[in-house]
């Protein structure tokens, strides 16, 4: 019995030691351009309007560009909720409008073992990202009262979806129903702690503070 316990403890120790020796994957960030004045820096839950170019590190080939492949239009996305790549959520925090960053994203924070489209499995990716605008996102504390249309101190899926549509339309972005539905479901999956179909003010604020 003692031998069994000793082996179990030893196995746990070795496993923990190996885990500690293996570094967590990180995004390499290079600031290419920065404004002289920065009134606001990005944080989790913010809506970001960006232009970007994505390249494969192995051969430098371009796999996507908003300038070329998106009718020349920048894109909106919400930071910190895995709406984009994990590498974006990690590498675009604390960014200012007018700032341009180069991100080198390892496979674990990109498309991993599966790859996607023109991107082979286990690809390291390079992105040049230009931040054009920051807005309060659907998960920001400041937006709660604006989203709570009936003032009942809780948010329904319809209220969150209506807010998203209004924000996207305000800035000339194309309203994509399936995109909004998926984003709302993701928000409720993370925010609706008691799974009652609503996000209370307490749930909203508590989750936002963790971002």
From Swiss-Prot:
Disulphide-bonded residues: 38-96
Binding residue positions for Ca(2+) 2: 192, 194, 196, 198, 203
Regulation acting on activity, per entry: Inhibited by tacrolimus/FK506.
Major site of localization recorded for this protein: endoplasmic reticulum
Subcellular location(s) of the protein: Endoplasmic reticulum lumen
Domain PPIase FKBP-type: 45-135
E.C. numbers: 5.2.1.8
Plastid in keyword set: no
Illness: Ehlers-Danlos syndrome, kyphoscoliotic type, 2: A form of Ehlers-Danlos syndrome, a group of connective tissue disorders characterized by skin hyperextensibility, articular hypermobility, and tissue fragility. EDSKSCL2 is an autosomal recessive form characterized by severe generalized hypotonia at birth, myopathy, early-onset progressive kyphoscoliosis, joint hypermobility without contractures, hyperelastic skin with follicular hyperkeratosis, easy bruising, and occasional abnormal scarring, sensorineural hearing impairment, and normal pyridinoline excretion in urine.
Protein name (Swiss-Prot/TrEMBL): Peptidyl-prolyl cis-trans isomerase FKBP14
Gene symbol of the encoding locus: FKBP14
């Amino acid at each position: 019995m003692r031998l069994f316990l000793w082996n179990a403890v030893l196995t746990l120790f070795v496993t923990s030691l190996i885990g500690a020796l293996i570094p967590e994957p990180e995004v390499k960030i290079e600031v290419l351009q920065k404004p002289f004045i920065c009134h606001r820096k990005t944080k989790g839950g913010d809506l970001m309007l960006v232009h970007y170019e994505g390249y494969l590190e192995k051969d430098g080939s371009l796999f996507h560009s908003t300038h070329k492949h998106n009718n020349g239009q920048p894109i909106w996305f919400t930071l910190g909720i895995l709406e984009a790549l994990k590498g974006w959520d990690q590498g675009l925090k604390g960014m200012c409008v007018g700032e341009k960053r180069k991100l080198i994203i390892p496979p674990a924070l990109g498309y991993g073992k599966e790859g996607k489209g023109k991107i082979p499995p286990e690809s390291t990716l390079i992105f040049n990202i230009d931040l054009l605008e920051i807005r309060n996102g659907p998960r920001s504390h400041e937006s709660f009262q604006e989203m709570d249309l009936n003032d009942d101190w809780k948010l329904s899926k319809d209220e969150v979806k209506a807010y998203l549509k209004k924000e996207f339309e305000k800035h000339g972005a194309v309203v994509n129903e399936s995109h909004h539905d998926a984003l709302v479901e993701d928000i409720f999956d993370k925010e609706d702690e008691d799974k009652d179909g609503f996000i209370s003010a307490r749930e909203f604020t508590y989750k936002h503070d963790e971002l």
